[in-house]
Amino acid sequence: MKLPGKIAIMGGGSWATAIAKMCLAQEESINWYMRRDDRIADFKRLGHNPAYLTGVKFDMKRINFSSNINDVVKESDTLIFVTPSPYLKAHLKKLKTRIRDKFIITAIKGIVPDDNLIVSEYFNKEYGVPPENIAVLAGPCHAEEVALERLSYLTIACPDKDKARVFARRLGSSFIKTSVSDDVIGIEYSSVLKNVYAIAAGICSGLKYGDNFQAVLISNAIQEMNRFLNTVHPINRNVDESVYLGDLLVTGYSNFSRNRTFGTMIGKGYSVKSAQIEMEMIAEGYYGTKCIKEINKHHHVNTVSYTHLTL
């Protein structure tokens, strides 16, 4: 099976930049949607993203930039969305071009606020994209380490595993190894939950609770995550795999983790607003806590560690 044509990156942050680097290891060229014309102009002038992963150089001849989302969608077949979940709906407001026939890949590790839908469900319900044309890109893979070409491992999940395998081959490289799964729902929810638990780990760090306490927290977190996933989407899965446990560990412990950093600042006494301003990046877990709390009202999963964050 061959996925058709051109890949488009939909977003301009650090993770979008890292994914663009991965794609260009295999693709001759890509389309790239960024909302701001001034950011595109600076990118073209400098040869790198002016705001994120500035050490990653790109060949401008291989990238077709545009701030017009409809033009990018029309000229692309596979759309990789890498917009922070709180802003996804705003980014899509200007979208008039039909996307139900496109192959959608979400690399967004969050829930669409107000709707309380994981991103794959949102594209299915709002835009009519069939589930077999939606994939999720996830795993223990920080953008900063991709920039440094450190060995990383990603999972591509799609109900149609043949499509997942095709994209996995297009994304793999000497420093990116890939696997495939069909657990779209479980992987999306685990990507949300691990950000929430990383904030908790950061708070513990900021409070100087120590490594022993954090080890217990993360141990409890994977058990809670397993209970939640088995309730929301009960299938036969192994949460010890890297896309679940591995992503939780790297997000909970790594200094590259923006959610852990956000939590550490809260633990040190920052207000939420002041932490957000100083970070200049989105900690998805902050928004995810409220969404998961609402979703769990329908499922009543016992999540003691998580519940303390939402009090």
Model regions: which residues?
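NAD(P)+-binding Rossmann beta1-loop-alpha1 motif at the extreme N-terminus of oxidoreductases
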Residues: 1-56, 64
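Short, conserved catalytic or adaptor-binding loops enriched in Gly and charged residues
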Residues: 53-61, 127-128, 170-171
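Internal alpha-helical scaffold of NAD(P)-dependent oxidoreductase catalytic cores
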Residues: 87, 98, 125-133, 151-238
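Interdomain hinge/lid region at the active-site interface
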Residues: 197-306
